[in-house]
Amino acid sequence: MIKSILLCFFFLFPLLLTLFKKLLPSKWKLPPGPTGLPIIGNLHQLGRLLHSSFHKLSLEHGPVMLLRFGVVPMVVISSKEAAKQVLKSRDLETCSRPKLVANGLFTRNFKDIAFAQYGEDWREMKKLVGLELFNPKKHKFFRYIREEEGDLLVKKLSKSSQTQTLVDLRKAFFSFTAGIIFRVSFGQNFRECDFIDMDRLEELVQESETNVFSFAFTDFFPTGLGWLVDRISGQHSRIEKAFSKLTKFFQHVIDEELKIGQSQDHSNLVSSMLDMINRSTEYGSFKITSDHLIAMMTDIVLGGVNAGTITMIWTMTELTRHPRVMKKLREEIRATLGPNKERITEEDLEKVEYLKLVIKETFRLHPPGPFLLPRQVMSDIEIQGYHIPKNAHIKISTYAIGRDPKCWTNPEEFNPERFANTSINYKGQHYELLPFGAGRRSCPGMTLGITILELGLLNILYYFDWSLPNGMTIKDIDMEEDGALTIAKKVPLELIPTLPASLCIK
């Protein structure tokens, strides 16, 4: 594909070369980076997995590396020191987002909080979502939903345990995670909906995520040229098609909420925002509209469902590959919680310390997103002695930082004990572990995300032993990665659950 693009752009070489020269004056001390080609910059040096390509390049060129995507300078951060400088010391100057085509389309011209540019509207929307979805009172109120979904997960797995059949853990975890997030946020149980089922919902989430983070030439090349290439290549059509499907789904959700007259207590986000729309409520500097609602629903679908599902799968993959860790964790869980526990509750989450270490280690090796969402520099700044020009994009590689030997001993080894007796956590104060980001653009759904993750894993590890299919050994587990925003395990993890003789499910 790159070769065909080069042919399309070749006749514009003199013009674009001039643009490059004007974009980054030579008097500045810019970050090092690989030499790019005219017109396309470094695009030809990127493989299928962007995080892996960036990591390899950073090992050669350093933790603050400059690439060029077309005419856009892209700074890649691969060390905790540089990440701290961006996210703490220079947070205000770097906390905006680039206006990328697919992001803007899916969020109704950036009326959300994940992709919106920094400003008053973004601040007010973040406050609103904090009050209506992620405040401690709401989190406590929705506890019953999370525990009910945990019960459903166990009951479903127990059927496979009785017949000793393989379980595709992606489907099991997706149903659990989506069940919680959609009931909490949208007020609807999609197992009972007539307009979609879980399999179609999973396909919709995957397609939406792939397209909202897909490469659009319009984002990195002069407007007319990028626009033309996106249409010739079919990229524009693919993005529009995925957007249309997701919008249609959201409209079904909204119609269902309107049909039942909305929740009287407006406990879920959709009901609460519909009430504000109907009352023409002014929130801060703007009025809440249906576009704000659709944009926030997009954030929830893209930011919540896949990330939790994928992290649970990687955790179970690493536990299966490391029997010592699995045995230690299982013994701690069952010894701490005792035999014949009828159900796992959220009080139990604070009792299993080793599980928290295991999750931290999974975050280190398999962060939910290998990069934090891209930032755009709002004014010229300096990072680690290098000049970063205004409007440059910054990508912070949590993947590379998690494998940095300057931060971690034997970084490729899965070893939860490395977090024992340390204060390192994932709440944004420790820049070697950033699954939820840090600073102004940190993830507002962190508490909900962690609760879902811990609850799902605790349920399946308390009630079941897990084994590979007959004839398969831990050396046969495929660790190949795939994905865009989140990096999933490409080959499904299929295991057999067994209910221990000492436990029973009522």
Curated annotation (Swiss-Prot):
Matching entries from SUPFAM superfamilies are given as: Cytochrome P450
Q: Which InterPro entries match?
A: Cyt_P450 (IPR001128), Cyt_P450_CS (IPR017972), Cyt_P450_E_grp-I (IPR002401), Cyt_P450_sf (IPR036396), Cytochrome_P450_71 (IPR050193)
One Gene Ontology term, aspect cellular component: membrane
Query: Where located?
Result: Membrane
Q: Which coenzyme or cofactor does it need?
A: heme
Superkingdom per UniProt: Eukaryota
Q: Which UniProt keywords apply?
A: Heme, Iron, Membrane, Metal-binding, Monooxygenase, Oxidoreductase, Transmembrane, Transmembrane helix
Does the UniProt entry include the keyword Ribosomal protein? no
The topology of this chain with respect to the membrane is: Single-pass membrane protein
Broad class of where this protein is predominantly found: membrane
> A Gene Ontology molecular-function term?
heme binding
- Which positions bind heme? 443
The portions of this protein that span the membrane are 5-25
Q: What is its EC number?
A: 1.14.-.-
Q: What protein family does this chain belong to?
A: Belongs to the cytochrome P450 family.
What is the protein's given name? Cytochrome P450 71B8
